[in-house]
From Swiss-Prot:
PROSITE patterns: DEHYDRATASE_SER_THR (PS00165). It comes from the Eukaryota. Mg(2+) 3 binds at E210, A214, D216. Homodimer. Disulfide bonds: none annotated. The gene is Srr. Its EC number is 5.1.1.18, 4.3.1.18, 4.3.1.17. Ca(2+) 3 binds at E210, A214, D216. Ca(2+) 4 binds at N247. This is Serine racemase. GO terms for biological process: D-serine biosynthetic process; L-serine metabolic process; pyruvate biosynthetic process; response to lipopolysaccharide; response to xenobiotic stimulus.
Amino acid sequence: MCAQYCISFADVEKAHINIQDSIHLTPVLTSSILNQIAGRNLFFKCELFQKTGSFKIRGALNAIRGLIPDTPEEKPKAVVTHSSGNHGQALTYAAKLEGIPAYIVVPQTAPNCKKLAIQAYGASIVYCDPSDESREKVTQRIMQETEGILVHPNQEPAVIAGQGTIALEVLNQVPLVDALVVPVGGGGMVAGIAITIKALKPSVKVYAAEPSNADDCYQSKLKGELTPNLHPPETIADGVKSSIGLNTWPIIRDLVDDVFTVTEDEIKYATQLVWGRMKLLIEPTAGVALAAVLSQHFQTVSPEVKNVCIVLSGGNVDLTSLNWVGQAERPAPYQTVSV
């Protein structure tokens, strides 16, 4: 694996050893109805059943355990991060396991259920405006005040390596898999998965999926350079509002085969399909990946890509904000970038 990347496959292997005793081996489920709709064999990696309700515990726990020194006296005074909710919950849970205080910078617009969950796990919440600039500024201030160590939600190498353990499990659970489809925000999960897949089974495709309202990953691939969102994105998929960053971009640029964008209606439709057909209460961010596969444009993907694994990234749903339920129409075509 090229030395220009922030992690190697060896880091993912170490992460697997580091965290496997404290996370769930999440199931892979199928749906014959969704297979018929998609025209492919779909396999759903159910990270909504993971501890803290999303895949984020993998990276958070790997990062926290990497901070634990040989002597208790050297333990960090605190850990700090910014998060729309899921990473904040995961980091707080992981830090609590090791007896470390956690401070989470949360956008004021984050779902209420996620804010309450972060508090329930024992973190101190600090609010910020829903922009990358505000998050970074407030995070730096809290780090100075607490003398805490930053655990970035998607650019920290230990976090990326932890998320890559998803792919290790998928290759064992679905040995004939042809492709993985992963929702992308900051890119930690898709980068970790891409590193793992291309090291172990490079013929398997890795596709990223994101809202068209937050399409920095698509734009970056299109232009061949890192192109962050200029304005705070408006999307119901709150877990993928962040832009990809300096550590995830090179991996995405080189190892992710395609980036698909989907509309808000497509996300709503796909999310409700999973609710109705599979009886799984996923959050809209998890619906982004299925929305990509159900789009007409995905039909241009080779029919040889028959067995497709979709990562259902989380299930932390704010039930009080579901005023859009029943409003979505069937998906329409969307964009893709081929490399």
